[in-house]
Every structure is written in structure tokens, then in C-alpha cells.
Amino acid sequence: MVVIPENVFAAMREHAREEAPNECCGLVVLRDGVAERYERGRNRLASPYRYELEIDPEIWFVEDDGYELAVFHSHPETEPIPSRTDQELSGLWGGRTFLIYGVKLDQLRAWQITRESF
């Protein structure tokens, strides 16, 4: 289970709305399953259907301090359910929590990535 405090969710929502109609992406820094902050990334593809996360590589070092990182992206027009494209790209993020925000529905959902499915 992942807990997203309102201030972190607000930052994620704001980023998604700013980037619409394209997908946005970033990382959520978690401690013991609770989100402490959202780190904006850049969608290198600038696409409404796909994303390629570009982010400061230094953020990955927070894992050395006991934090976890969850991968976040938005679906501007569709439900926050992993798409076929998301499933194809999931191998990049194996073992991480996958957060998807549906902009139109104002809904955030969390998924756990496995080799077989979400």
C-alpha cells in the first residue's frame, strides 16, 4: 500500500495538468510506503500516448538512504489503468510501484509491477 499525502498529490496533479495534453512523468520519493515528495521529470517524447522519463540522475541515490522510488506518469484522456504501452515499458521499472494519474477523472491509482502483469 502507498500513502500519498495531499501536498504530494497536489504537486503531481499540477504537473499533469500543466503538461496535458501530453503525458507527464516523474518519481515519488517514499519512506515506509508514505510519499514524502514528488520529483518532476520531463517526458522526452512530449507525447499524449507515451513517455520517456528524463530526470536528474542524482535522485536515484536516495535509495541508498533507505527511500523507495515510485514511477509516476499521467494519462491525459484515459483511466489510470496501465495501457499496453505501459505494460511493454514496465520492464524498465521492475519491482517498483507504478503510479498513474487520470487527468480527466482526477484519479490516482497505484500498481505493482511484476514480470507477468500489473
Enumerate the predicted regions with their spans.
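Conserved beta-strand-loop surface patch within small alpha/beta domains used
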Residues: 1-68, 77-118
